[in-house]
Amino acid sequence: MDLTVNLGGIKLKNPVAVASGTFGYGLEYADFIEPEKIGAVIVKGTTLHPRPGNPGPRIYETPAGMLNAIGLENPGIEVFLREYLPRLRERQVTVIANIAGNSIEEYALMASLLQGQEGIAGIELNISCPNVKQGGIQFGTDPETVRQVVAAVKKETSLPVIPKLSPNVTDIVAIALAAADGGADALSMINTLGGMAININLKKPVLGNIFGGLSGPAIKPVALKMIYQVYREVDLPILGGGGIVNHIDALEFFMAGATAVSIGTGNFVNPCLALELLEGIKKYMQEQGFSSIQELVGIAHA
């Protein structure tokens, strides 16, 4: 049985990754799961300089998921490269870095710092950040800005570049086409949906940041629809995620058009989910007579 996939030039031993922001740097979970056995660990979002993150509360549980407004708390790219990457390299973890910038120039600079670093397999771009130079509009909501960010990063690195698409748009295909035009090697989708909650006793928003990102099973139908749409129109491999909590969910994503899947919120519930889910995928493939995971990709379009 062949579980290997090629995600835009990144060779994965299996098609199950863990999503950025839900698995730390991979090392935090090492008491529960061997991170090197996961297809890829997409590490915590990294910025050029250290960031303290948003004021609390930062997380709020919803009936079918959770809202988070962490605010990209992280020690900065230099600390990641100096302290975390060598330990991941020792364990032979397939690492995909995740970077977030305040400007196109910052994305390009971080890409240049990652270029040539042994142990980095690719770069995921968090483009759900406000563009400080353009009045705070999110990079990922404007097709031309998406194209510019991807193109600027591609100029600075030979690593595969994977923009993570925001679902908070009216036309996801237009955004995906712009990313492809900028030179993206693959697409990661989807990021969180914007949301909020209100405490009726305090009569104010629950989250310190007021707004947050909704993740978990609630967003799965949205993710599936968007992946299905993009698969039909854009010739790039897709890393699909959004509400995957079991192997049945993952299989739906493959059939919609995802080459690989990423587990996010589910990691908080079950740290071993990625590998348990992989076993479920294998069992399904055996029962259904599939010899390669690639046979499942996009099969719902046939």
UniProtKB/Swiss-Prot annotation:
Its EC number is 1.3.1.14. It catalyses: (S)-dihydroorotate + NAD(+) = orotate + NADH + H(+). It is an enzyme of class 1 (oxidoreductase). GO terms for molecular function: dihydroorotate dehydrogenase (NAD+) activity. Pfam families: DHO_dh. Disulfide bonds: none annotated. Transmembrane segments: none annotated. Catalyzes the conversion of dihydroorotate to orotate with NAD(+) as electron acceptor. This is Dihydroorotate dehydrogenase B (NAD(+)), catalytic subunit. It comes from Syntrophomonas wolfei subsp. wolfei (strain DSM 2245B / Goettingen). The gene is pyrD.
